[in-house]
């Protein structure tokens, strides 16, 4: 290419620093980049953006894969990549996303801290239903387009704050996502270890090579249970997250302690799993004879005959071939009973969750526990460091060293920066409901955010994306906010953990 032409092209190229104001507004940090809260300098709009700078020179295969996918994916419940900026002077790459003020990691932490402070404030069941519905809707879109997310967890589920899309769920961190139509080789050969331990399906832990969409469904079941209880259902001690061996004794032990050991009739193909001999050697069925999901959820006041439990049971089915699909889950009776899911998950309530705080450019993101520096490779949206409550909250379950690299809702000790009161529900619940006998369906991003989820708001796309994914190695990615750019994280909930996901 002619040198003069290249120089002219470089001079005309839009530069991030000329277009956006972001200095001093860092909200996330990871080994692969930084995330800033940004606004346009020209004042064309008052919209807030998440501006992610990828560290180093050039761009990784993981980032290439994510960019390629995000440029094709268009859905109200999937984070939108607005633009990519390439700087030829310093060879840096910038990604521009919509900005989400909250995420499920911080929202759940807020409620868990309220329990620790003996002022329990449960997530409203109507909010849980709307959150789950939108997560399923977004995943249904990805699966219909032959995309596996493979790293679903609370930190990667963003929730929009005040604005036109108030309360809208955005699935973020597509750094692990892969197309699954006709892979050249088994996916397990390409990425031996995928998904944060606590949200990893049992077939992955047993070495399944040709895993399917069912791994995302299991992770959604884990998130659903966590929304209902404010505790990670399968939390356990974390070992070396870089291992290429999928078998994880402690994680399987935790799953069996909650669910019980699967009977042969319930999971016939378990004997075909590569790690089944190890399972037989290390575990005894009788150890878990008194364990069941029913007993676990009854402790959290969820009745076994309720529609909420029956759907959870379908999502957390051990046999992946019997696990419910996202499409089937969207049709579940749970979503047909009142209160119906809404486009704005906060419908009828004030938002009590703190906004993200800005990070100091020089201070390390994790000031407390340095073990939290280990994070699984993932991409996340900006999150602000959680504020500390007067008394340090005691986390009921061991907190995950953010394999949730904080997707984050801006921090959240009970009562921190938020209202001391619980969420206040609207007196007229009919305003937020879908007409009777209508199948709820989330509307387009331009829809009235507080309105009911209408069946005809939009149709799911079933067409395949015209994109061939590049193969990533087995390294795990860590994240800077839900705006994904690979980074490593270890899995433990911790009040000070704050990597935002994009």
From Swiss-Prot:
InterPro entries: CDK, Kinase-like_dom_sf, Prot_kinase_dom, Protein_kinase_ATP_BS, Ser/Thr_kinase_AS. Residues 21-335 form the Protein kinase domain. Its EC number is 2.7.11.22. The modification N-acetylmethionine is found at residue 1. The active site is at 151 (proton acceptor). Changing residue 196 to A: In DEE87; fails to rescue neurologic phenotypes in a Drosophila model system. It catalyses: L-seryl-[protein] + ATP = O-phospho-L-seryl-[protein] + ADP + H(+); L-threonyl-[protein] + ATP = O-phospho-L-threonyl-[protein] + ADP + H(+). It is found in: Cytoplasm; Cytoplasm, Perinuclear region; Nucleus. Residues 359-502 are annotated as: Disordered. It holds the Pfam family Pkinase. Residues 408-421 have a biased composition (Gly residues). One of its GO terms (biological process) is positive regulation of apoptotic process. The keyword Acetylation applies. Residues 371-392, 468-496 have a biased composition (Low complexity). Keywords: Acetylation, ATP-binding, Cytoplasm, Disease variant, Epilepsy, Kinase, Nucleotide-binding, Nucleus, Phosphoprotein, Serine/threonine-protein kinase, Transferase. One of its GO terms (cellular component) is cytosol. Residues 424-435, 458-467 have a biased composition (Polar residues). GO terms for molecular function: ATP binding; cyclin-dependent protein serine/threonine kinase activity; protein serine kinase activity; protein serine/threonine kinase activity. The modification Phosphoserine is found at residue 449. ATP binds at residues 27-35, 52. Belongs to the protein kinase superfamily. CMGC Ser/Thr protein kinase family. CDC2/CDKX subfamily. PANTHER family: CELL DIVISION PROTEIN KINASE (PTHR24056), CYCLIN-DEPENDENT KINASE 19 (PTHR24056:SF570). It is linked to Developmental and epileptic encephalopathy 87: A form of epileptic encephalopathy, a heterogeneous group of severe early-onset epilepsies characterized by refractory seizures, neurodevelopmental impairment, and poor prognosis. Development is normal prior to seizure onset, after which cognitive and motor delays become apparent. DEE87 inheritance is autosomal dominant. This is Cyclin-dependent kinase 19. It comes from Homo sapiens (Human).
């Amino acid at each position: 290419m002619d040198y003069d032409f290249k120089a002219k092209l470089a001079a005309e190229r839009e530069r991030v620093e000329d277009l956006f104001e972001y200095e001093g507004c860092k909200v996330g940090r990871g080994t692969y980049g930084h995330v800033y809260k940004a606004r346009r300098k020209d004042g064309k709009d008052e919209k807030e953006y998440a501006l992610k700078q990828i560290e180093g020179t050039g761009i990784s295969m993981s980032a290439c894969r994510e960019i390629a996918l995000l440029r094709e994916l268009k859905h109200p419940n999937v984070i939108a990549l607005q633009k990519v900026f390439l700087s030829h002077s310093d060879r840096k790459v910038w990604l521009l996303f919509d900005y989400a003020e909250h995420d499920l990691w911080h929202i759940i932490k807020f409620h868990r801290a309220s329990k620790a402070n003996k002022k329990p404030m449960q997530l409203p069941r109507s909010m849980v239903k709307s959150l789950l519905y939108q997560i399923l809707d977004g995943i249904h879109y990805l699966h219909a387009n032959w995309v596996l997310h493979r790293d679903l967890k609370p930190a990667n589920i963003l929730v929009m704050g005040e604005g036109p899309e108030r309360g809208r769920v955005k699935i973020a961190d597509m750094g692990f996502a892969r197309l699954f139509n006709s892979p050249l080789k088994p996916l397990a050969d390409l990425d031996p270890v995928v998904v944060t331990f606590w949200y990893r399906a049992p077939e992955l832990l047993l070495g399944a090579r040709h895993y399917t969409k069912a791994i995302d469904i299991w992770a959604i079941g884990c998130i659903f249970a966590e929304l209902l209880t404010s505790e990670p259902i399968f939390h356990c001690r974390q070992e070396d997250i870089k291992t290429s061996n999928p078998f994880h004794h402690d994680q399987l032990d935790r799953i069996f302690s909650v669910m019980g050991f699967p009977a042969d009739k319930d999971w016939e193909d378990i004997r075909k799993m590569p790690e089944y001999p190890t399972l037989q050697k290390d575990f005894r069925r009788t150890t878990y004879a008194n364990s069941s999901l029913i007993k676990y959820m009854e402790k959290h006041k969820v009745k076994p005959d309720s529609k909420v439990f029956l759907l959870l049971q379908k999502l957390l089915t051990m046999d992946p071939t019997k696990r419910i699909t996202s499409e089937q889950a969207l049709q579940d009776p749970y979503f047909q009973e009142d209160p119906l899911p809404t486009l704005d998950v906060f419908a009828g309530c004030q938002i009590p969750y703190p906004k993200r705080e800005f990070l100091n450019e020089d201070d390390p993101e994790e000031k407390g526990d340095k073990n939290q520096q280990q994070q699984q490779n993932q991409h996340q949206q900006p999150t602000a460091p959680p504020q500390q409550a007067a008394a340090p909250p005691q986390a009921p379950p061991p907190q995950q060293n953010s394999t949730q690299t904080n997707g984050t809702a801006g921090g959240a000790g009970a009562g921190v920066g938020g209202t001391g009161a619980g969420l206040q529900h609207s007196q007229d619940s009919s305003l937020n409901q879908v007409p009777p006998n209508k199948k709820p369906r989330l509307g387009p991003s331009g829809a009235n955010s507080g309105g009911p989820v209408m069946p005809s708001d939009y149709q799911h796309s079933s067409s395949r994306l015209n994109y061939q994914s590049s193969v990533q190695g087995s390294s795990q990615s860590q994240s800077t906010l839900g705006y994904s750019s690979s980074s490593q994280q270890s899995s433990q909930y911790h009040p000070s953990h704050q990597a935002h996901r994009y």
